C-alpha cells in the first residue's frame, strides 16, 4: 500500500510539473484594451502629428491605405505572436558566434545574395494572425537559396493549417519557435504545392475581416506534385543569443532570421526612418524577417526588416527599427534553423563550395 501511495504521489508531482511547464509562458503580452478602444480606428491624425512634430522621433508617420478603414481590433488580429509555453524551449540551443568575427557596418541580405530573389519578396498575410508563420517560412525559404542555390517559396499554408495546436491557434496566433520545430519533424511543402491563395485569387484572409484557419489537406493543388516529395526540412532549430553582435553574425553567415517584437499603435502609422516607440498602447506581438542592418544619416543604428503587410504599408513594405537598445523587445528572441538536403536536388553551380555573402 505504501509503495502504491508513493507511486501515486510521484505521478501527481510529474503531472503538476508538466502542467507548470505547459502554462509557464514566455514572450510578448498585450495590454488589456477596452471595447471602446478596440472599436476605434487604428489610424489617428493625432498620432501622426505627435510623431512628426517630435524632433527626436527619427521616423515619419502617415495615414497609409493598408489600414485606412481598420479598427484597433482588426489590426490587433494581425499581431499573431502568442506568449510561448516554456516547454517549447526545452532542449533548444542558444547559438552564439565568435565575437572576433569582423562584420560590415551595413549589411543587406538582398544585395549579399542577389541570386536569392525570395529575400526581397514582400508578401501579405491578409486578415489572418499568421505573422508567426510568415516570418519562419520566408526566412527558411531564403536559407534554402543561400545554402543550396535554389530559389523556392515554401508554403505558409502548410505550416498554418497542419501544425495544429503545437504551433498555437493558426490565424488566431502562434509560436515562432514551434514553427521552426515543425520544419524539423514534419517539413514544409512549397507554395506551388499548397498556396496561400484560394482559386479566386483571394489571399487567405483577404476577403473576410476574420478569416478562419484553413483546413489541412495534405494534398498538392496540382495533381503533378506529391505532398511528401514537395516537403522541405530543417536540420536544426535554435534561438540566437540576444545581443546585436550575435544576431548580425547569424544573418551574415546563414541568412535572414525571424524576430518578434511588441507593436504599439504608432507602428501602424510607420512610413519611413528608424522606428522607435513614441506613443500609443501596446496592441500585441508581431513576427517579421530580419534581413540586415545599418546606420542612418542621423547616426541611428538600425535593423532592416521585411514585413508582410504588402508594399502599400511602410517603406515599400519594409521598415527600420532602432538597433542595440532592444527596441520593443526586437532583440529578445531571434529564431532560426538550417535547411536540410533531404528532398533537395542541388543546383549545379560548377563548384563544390556553398554560396557565400558578397559584400
UniProtKB/Swiss-Prot annotation:
Q: What are the protein's UniProt keywords?
A: Disulfide bond, Glycoprotein, Hydrolase, Plant defense, Protease, Signal, Thiol protease, Vacuole
Annotated compartments: Vacuole
Task: Name which cysteines form disulfide bonds.
Answer: 116-145, 128-171, 162-216, 163-167, 193-220, 202-207
How might one describe the regulation of this protein's activity? Inhibited by the cathepsin B inhibitors Ac-LVK-CHO, CA-074 and Z-FA-FMK, and the caspase-3 inhibitor Z-DEVD-CHO.
Q: Which PROSITE patterns match?
A: THIOL_PROTEASE_CYS (PS00139), THIOL_PROTEASE_HIS (PS00639)
Distribution of this protein across tissues and organs? Expressed in root tips, root vasculature, emerging lateral root, hydathodes, vascular tissue of leaves, vasculature of sepals and anthers, stigma, and vascular bundles at the base and the upper part of the siliques.
Q: Specify where it is mainly localized.
A: other
The induction comment states: By dark-induced senescence. Induced by infection with an avirulent strain of the bacterial pathogen Pseudomonase syringae pv. tomato DC3000.
Q: Which residues form the propeptide?
A: 27-102, 343-359
Per the record, what phenotype accompanies loss of this gene's function?
Delayed germination and decreased germination rate.
Q: Name one GO biological process term.
A: defense response
Q: Read off the Pfam families from this record.
A: Peptidase_C1, Propeptide_C1
Where is carbohydrate linked to this protein?
69, 151
**According to the record, how does pH govern the activity?**
Optimum pH is 5.5.
- Family as reported in the entry's similarity comment: Belongs to the peptidase C1 family.
Q: Per its database record, what is this protein's job?
A: Thiol protease that possesses high activity toward the cathepsin synthetic substrate Arg-Arg-7-amino-4-methylcoumarin (RR-AMC) and the papain substrate Gly-Arg-Arg-AMC (GRR-AMC). Can cleave the papain substrate Phe-Arg-AMC (FR-AMC) and the caspase-3 substrate Asp-Glu-Val-Asp-rhodamine 110 (DEVD-R110). Has no activity towards the caspase-6 substrate VEID-AMC, caspase-8 substrate IETD-AMC and caspase-1 substrate YVAD-AMC. Plays a central role in plant programmed cell death (PCD).
Query: What is the protein name stated in its UniProt record?
Result: Cathepsin B-like protease 3
**What species was this sequence derived from?**
Arabidopsis thaliana
The protein's gene is named: CATHB3
Amino acid at each position: 500500500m505504501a509503495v502504491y501511495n508513493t507511486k501515486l504521489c510521484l505521478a501527481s508531482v510529474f503531472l503538476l510539473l508538466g502542467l507548470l511547464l505547459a502554462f509557464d509562458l514566455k514572450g510578448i503580452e498585450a495590454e488589456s484594451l477596452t471595447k471602446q478602444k478596440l472599436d476605434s480606428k487604428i489610424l489617428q491624425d493625432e498620432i501622426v502629428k505627435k510623431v512628426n512634430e517630435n524632433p527626436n522621433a527619427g521616423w515619419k508617420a502617415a495615414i497609409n491605405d493598408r489600414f485606412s478603414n481598420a479598427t484597433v481590433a482588426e489590426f490587433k488580429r494581425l499581431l499573431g505572436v502568442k506568449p510561448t509555453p516554456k516547454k517549447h524551449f526545452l532542449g533548444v540551443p542558444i547559438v552564439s558566434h565568435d565575437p572576433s568575427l569582423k562584420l560590415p557596418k551595413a549589411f543587406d541580405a538582398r544585395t549579399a545574395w542577389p541570386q536569392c530573389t525570395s529575400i526581397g519578396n514582400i508578401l501579405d498575410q491578409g486578415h489572418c494572425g499568421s505573422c508567426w508563420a510568415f516570418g519562419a517560412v520566408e526566412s527558411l525559404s531564403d536559407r534554402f537559396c543561400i545554402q543550396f542555390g535554389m530559389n523556392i517559396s515554401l508554403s505558409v499554408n502548410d505550416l498554418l493549417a497542419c501544425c495544429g495546436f503545437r504551433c498555437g491557434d493558426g490565424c488566431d496566433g502562434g509560436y515562432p519557435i514551434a514553427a521552426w520545430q515543425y520544419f524539423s519533424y514534419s517539413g514544409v511543402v512549397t507554395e506551388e504545392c499548397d498556396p496561400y491563395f484560394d482559386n479566386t485569387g483571394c489571399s487567405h484572409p483577404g476577403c473576410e475581416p476574420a478569416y478562419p484557419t484553413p483546413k489541412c489537406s495534405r494534398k498538392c493543388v496540382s495533381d503533378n506534385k506529391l505532398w511528401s516529395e514537395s516537403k522541405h526540412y530543417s536540420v536544426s532549430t535554435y534561438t540566437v543569443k540576444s545581443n546585436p553582435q550575435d544576431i548580425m553574425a547569424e544573418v551574415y553567415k546563414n541568412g535572414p532570421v525571424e524576430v518578434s517584437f511588441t507593436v504599439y499603435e504608432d507602428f501602424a502609422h510607420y512610413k519611413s526612418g528608424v522606428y522607435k516607440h513614441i506613443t500609443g498602447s501596446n496592441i500585441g506581438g508581431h513576427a517579421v524577417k530580419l534581413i540586415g542592418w545599418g546606420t542612418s544619416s542621423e547616426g541611428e543604428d538600425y535593423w532592416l526588416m521585411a514585413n508582410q503587410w504588402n508594399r502599400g504599408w511602410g517603406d515599400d513594405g519594409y521598415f527600420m527599427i532602432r538597433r542595440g537598445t532592444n527596441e520593443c523587445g526586437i532583440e529578445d528572441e531571434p529564431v532560426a534553423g538550417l535547411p536540410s538536403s533531404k528532398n533537395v536536388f542541388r543546383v549545379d553551380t560548377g563548384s563544390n563550395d556553398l554560396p557565400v555573402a558578397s559584400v
